[in-house]
UniProtKB/Swiss-Prot annotation:
Domain PH: 370-469, 616-715
Gene name for this UniProt entry: FGD3
Compositionally skewed regions (Basic and acidic residues) per UniProt: 521-533
Sequence positions that bind Zn(2+) 1: C538, C541, C563, C566
Domain DH: 157-341
Keyword field contains Disulfide bond: no
Function: Promotes the formation of filopodia. May activate CDC42, a member of the Ras-like family of Rho- and Rac proteins, by exchanging bound GDP for free GTP. Plays a role in regulating the actin cytoskeleton and cell shape.
Protein name as catalogued: FYVE, RhoGEF and PH domain-containing protein 3
Zinc finger (FYVE-type): 532-588
Keyword flag Repeat: yes
Binding-site residues, Zn(2+) 2: C555, C558, C580, C583
Keywords: Cytoplasm, Cytoskeleton, Guanine-nucleotide releasing factor, Metal-binding, Phosphoprotein, Repeat, Zinc, Zinc-finger
Length: 737
């Protein structure tokens, strides 16, 4: 190098440490070649001694530093020190006489470069130029060095991700210990009721044991002791990830738990004192109980993010690739379970809000109901076309047409009309004097509605039409497959019985041949449905019904709605059988002069029975159901393969039952005590929130199969994931589950 006019010293060590060079006279390639990295590179070589002996920095002709070129250590993530002032000491300048020492940058052996510092003559310095392209024969060597740096950075980043996972897991286990062993234990010792403790902390003890006794120890052993020989995470996570589904129960209960904490803090001084005394401790970090309760809700999505980052850095041919991908799939499933539970809780909260707005006029707080859309709308008067303010609530099974109430608190709307989605029609209309109008037509009445804009009208029409179509698709699940259930009830029915359907929800079974009550074979099974009740006129004479002089009746054979004049009466075993004229003339109800010696033939039931689900199911079959434990009804129950976490129940039309769908992950199962004295065989109880149902099977074995399948779904799992999973069932003939 030149100083003032002058002499030169070997620039290698200075360049390697990022010291100022001599300006235009130094070569960038020479600096890279002089970088003392590698296992044999040390500060005791001749070039280093020469540099250490000269404590002054080279300057240009002006006496100032000619440059401060910074040499980054490329992909290793470590930058060399930038330019420093004269006399600054670096680690490799201390103890030079002590012989070989570790490298300054601690580089991997694969990154080792030539440790010999080349001697650069003044002529070579004068001929070199910083802006020149590097020598062609040195270019492959530089490419090899960059490739080595890139290969080294991958394993290091994987190790950093693993260490981050371990660190966050240790912190998380401490939070779980705080919730389980401090808050929960102290509140229990203080005498807080057990049901309150369970409502607040749910299954936090199980989550704590899983992480503290299984996941954390395995991660710690692998990352701190075995990583050099077995750098893998996928095998551990794949083995333990299925247990993360237990978070579903905690997440579903979270909002209720937070509400309990707030309520008991306000109403119980003892509860408040215990919680506040713990929150003041250093282990709480000045955070509230609710804040710590939130951590399990957020933990599973964090696993998913870390594992995605790990897979992104993992080479395609790595031995851990398949295990890591499978682990991500399982963890994503657990995260989806948690998210689904959150969405169900949010939907239920919305239903409860609407229930309060309606003042409890309609019992809509049912897990099968789903609020799809609500909004203000105007109804055009049928008399003079005057617009009137109204409010619509669109659910998956009905529309509530409401009138606003002028109240600041409490009930906001009164239900004027309830319209079932089944049989509903929506139609766009164009009127010359009124814009943005459409008509909703139900079984009992039609509503002409108006929106503020054309876009709002189109949105309402599209959403209502989509809801109608979806309801039709769901109703087809319960179409005419009554042979499986009705034959099990009545063996006299032929397996080849033709099945027809007059509606997507309620099938009608027709028979050919055979004998019926008193020598009569019904042509159809009768049913008393809501649709029949809503019919306005007699099918025979056409006169309009009213509640006083023209009442509705049903034919006991074909089920049509008729008036009293159009029916005939015949005594039969001290009972009356009302039939229409057509059925009476074709096939009389009873012989006009029955023989007292003739044995009475068993009368075939004219009521429809629940029908089977044609879709493949994990478990399906006939059950008995009761909401009170006293009155029982026959139902067809099915857990479909397409959605194994819901229970479909289809009841007989004589019970006025509509299809019900019960979300199983939010339900609780129990077997009633013998003291309850439920006289219906093998019974168990299914409970959701404040609603409960009693279900009864025909045998203990069948009861056990239902309990196992329902329990699996209630835990947020699926039958396919559990050992000994049930085989899918397709109802055919009279097969029972």
């Amino acid at each position: 190098m030149e100083s003032g006019g002058g002499s030169s010293t070997p620039p290698g060590p200075i360049a390697a440490l990022g010291m100022p060079d001599s300006g235009p006279g130094s070569s960038s390639l020479g600096k890279l070649q002089a970088l003392p990295v590698g296992p044999r590179a040390h500060c005791g070589d001749p070039g280093s001694l020469a540099a250490a002996g000269d404590g002054s920095l080279d300057t240009g002709s002006t006496g100032e530093l000619s440059g401060s070129l910074k040499i980054p250590n490329r992909d290793s993530g470590i930058d060399s020190p930038s330019s420093s002032v004269a006399g600054e000491n670096f680690p490799c300048e201390e103890g030079l006489e002590a012989g070989p020492s570790p490298t300054v940058l601690g580089a991997h052996p694969e990154m080792a470069l030539d440790s010999q510092v080349p001697k650069v003559t003044p002529r070579e310095e004068a001929d070199s130029d910083v802006g020149e392209e590097p020598d062609s024969e040195n270019t492959p060597q530089k490419a090899d060095k960059d490739a080595g740096l890139a290969q080294h950075s991958g394993p290091q980043k994987l190790l950093h991700i693993a260490q981050e996972l371990l660190h966050t897991e240790e912190t998380y286990v401490k939070r779980l210990h705080l919730l389980d062993q401090v808050f929960c234990t102290r509140l229990t010792d203080a005498g807080i009721p057990p049901e309150v403790i369970m409502g607040i902390f749910s299954n936090i003890s199980s989550i704590h044991r899983f992480h503290g006794q299984f996941l954390l120890p395995e991660l710690k052993t692998r990352i701190t002791e075995e990583w050099d020989t077995n750098p893998r995470l996928g095998d551990i996570l794949q083995k333990l990830a299925p247990f993360l589904k237990m978070y579903g129960e905690y997440v579903k209960n979270f909002d209720r738990a937070v509400g309990l904490v707030s309520t008991w803090t306000q109403r119980s001084p003892l509860f408040k004192d215990v919680v506040h005394s713990i929150q003041k401790q250093e282990v709480c970090g000045n955070l509230t109980l609710q804040h710590h309760m939130l951590e399990p809700v957020q933990r599973v999505p964090r696993y998913e993010l870390l594992l995605k980052d790990y897979l992104k850095r993992l080479p395609q041919d790595a031995p851990d690739q398949k295990d890591a991908e499978r682990s991500l799939e399982l963890i994503s499933t657990a995260a989806n379970h948690s998210n689904a539970a959150i969405r169900k809780v949010e939907k239920m909260h919305k239903l409860l809000e609407v229930y309060e707005q309606l003042g409890g006029e309609e019992d809509i707080a049912n897990p099968a109901n789903e609020l799809i859309k609500e909004g203000q709308i105007q109804k055009l008067s049928a008399k003079n076309g005057t617009p009137q303010d109204r409010h619509l609530f669109l659910f998956n099974s009905m529309i509530l047409y409401c009138v606003p109430k002028l109240r600041l608190m409490g009930q906001k709307f009164s239900v004027r009309e309830k319209m079932d989605i089944s049989g509903l029609q929506v139609q766009d209309i164009v009127k010359p004097n009124t814009a943005h109008t459409f008509i909703i037509t139900g079984r009992k009445r039609s509503l002409e509605l108006q929106t503020r804009t054309e876009e709002e009208k189109k949105e309402w029409i599209q959403i209502i039409q989509a809801t109608i179509e979806k309801h039709k698709q769901n109703s087809e699940t319960f179409k005419a497959f009554g042979g499986a259930f009705s034959q099990d009830e009545d063996p006299s029915l032929s397996p080849d019985m033709p099945i027809t359907s007059t509606s997507p929800v309620e099938p009608v079974v027709t028979t050919e041949g055979g004998s019926g009550a008193a020598g009569l074979e019904p042509r159809k099974l009768s049913s008393k449905t809501r649709r029949d009740k809503e019919k306005q006129s007699c099918k025979s004479c056409g006169e309009t019904f009213n509640s006083i002089t023209k009442r509705r009746h049903h034919c006991k054979l074909c089920g049509v709605v008729i008036c009293g004049k159009c029916s005939e009466f015949k005594a039969e075993n001290s009972r009356q059988s009302r039939v229409c004229r057509e059925c009476f003339l074709t096939q009389p109800v009873a012989p006009e002069s029955p023989s007292p010696e003739a044995p009475a033939k068993p009368r075939r039931s004219t009521e429809k029975t629940p029908t089977a689900d044609p879709q493949p199911s994990l478990l399906c079959g006939p059950l008995r159901l009761s909401e009170s434990g006293e009155t029982w009804s026959e139902v067809w129950a099915a857990i479909p393969m397409s959605d194994p976490q819901v229970l479909h129940l289809q009841g007989g039309s004589q019970d006025g039952w509509l299809p019900r769908t019960i979300p199983l992950p939010s339900c609780k199962l129990s077997v009633p005590d013998p003291e309850e004295r439920l006289d219906s065989g093998h019974v168990w109880k299914l409970q959701w929130a404040k609603q409960s149902w009693y279900l009864s099977a025909s045998s203990a074995e069948l009861q056990q199969r239902w309990l196992e399948t329902l329990s699996t779904a209630a835990r947020g799992d699926t039958a396919q994931d559990s050992p000994g999973a049930l085989q899918p069932q397709v109802p055919t003939g009279a097969a029972a589950p």
